[in-house]
Amino acid sequence: MLKTIALDAMGGDHGPKVIVPAALSILKKHPKVKLTLVGKEDQLALLIPEKNRKSFGQRLEIIHASEEVGMDEPPSQALRTKKNSSMRVAINLVKEGQAHACVSAGNTGALMATARYVLKTLPGIDRPAIIAAFPTKNEREVRVLDLGANVDSTPENLYQFAVMGSILSSAAHNIRNPRIGLLNVGEEEIKGNELVKKANELFETRKTINYIGYVEGNTIFNNIADVVVCDGFVGNAVLKASEGVAQLIKQHAKEAFSEAWWTKLALLPAIPILKRLIRRVDPERYNGATFLGLNGIVVKSHGSANIKAFVCAVEEAIFQVDKNIPQLIKEEVAHILKEFENK
């Protein structure tokens, strides 16, 4: 059976110019995937070579959507007035069972508002959270949530985020009990604001996750936790700062190789090492944040993503379809709620 992914082809800073070539790349790489491009049909058709149309056949589909959501458009306005936007139509395909997942590089707020309105949250989940993978000092990734869906959260919200993050991490790394850390300004019990302290008490009381305690910002990438939980305000700051540092490393590496020829000659032995370093911290490789907790799979690509980065976002969606992440969360949450009822 083909896995069908709906792509909001008009979303992001570059729209179809990035998304269509990325789609063609995915279809070449994943023979059991079907992609549905949602957007302005005349624009999309022009970007697909005839040879690709013939070779991919039914695995490449275009569904016309007459509207698109602007990157700066207020979420409430997009939800209310853009019912035939490429974003809305792509999410509707997931709701109607015509697609297994949706990927968009569009307006984050509008995507979250629309996805939550159309798909609703899973039973037992109050709010969805944004989760993404980050590199660590070894090959295993750490997943951090919430990265900006909820600026104001409750301890119960953070606990639900931890449960969902644990399920996704377990599926991604084939580990039984992922280590869950709570992001704080220190490891001592007395440190942190009221939200973090109360969440810590809740995490310790409920034995349903492998909670290891507080994690500080400078140890997120040290492989001491598989999942790091925080509210959306803090998480978004972590995300943006991490992306900035990664871009800085790439920029300095490029500048080093643009120096005089004798500098380049001296750096020759280090080229393989530098390439590995740049690859490991490259934000493009980790592009694709998931709106976790919805009754369907929605993956958000960075708005400025290039072809390579958008491919990574689509592959994250394919992975979650393979593992049926929403169903795993639904089953685990139901099991936890039943345990609480029996106590």
Swiss-Prot record:
InterPro entries in alphabetical order: FA_synthesis (IPR003664), Phospholipid_synth_PlsX-like (IPR012281)
Cited function: Catalyzes the reversible formation of acyl-phosphate (acyl-PO(4)) from acyl-[acyl-carrier-protein] (acyl-ACP). This enzyme utilizes acyl-ACP as fatty acyl donor, but not acyl-CoA.
Signal sequence, start to end: none
Protein name: Phosphate acyltransferase
UniProt pathway annotation: Lipid metabolism; phospholipid metabolism
One Pfam family recorded for the sequence: FA_synthesis
Keyword Cytoplasm: yes
Quaternary assembly: Homodimer. Probably interacts with PlsY.
Disulfide-bond pairs as recorded: none
Localisation per UniProt entry: Cytoplasm
HAMAP family on file: PlsX
Gene: plsX
Enzyme class: transferase
Alphabetic keyword roster: Cytoplasm, Lipid biosynthesis, Lipid metabolism, Phospholipid biosynthesis, Phospholipid metabolism, Transferase
GO biological process: fatty acid biosynthetic process; phospholipid biosynthetic process
EC number: 2.3.1.274
A molecular-function term among this protein's GO annotations: phosphate:acyl-[acyl carrier protein] acyltransferase activity
Catalysed reactions listed for this entry: a fatty acyl-[ACP] + phosphate = an acyl phosphate + holo-[ACP]
Gene Ontology CC: cytoplasm
Organism expressing this protein natively: Coxiella burnetii (strain CbuG_Q212) (Coxiella burnetii (strain Q212))
Family: Belongs to the PlsX family.
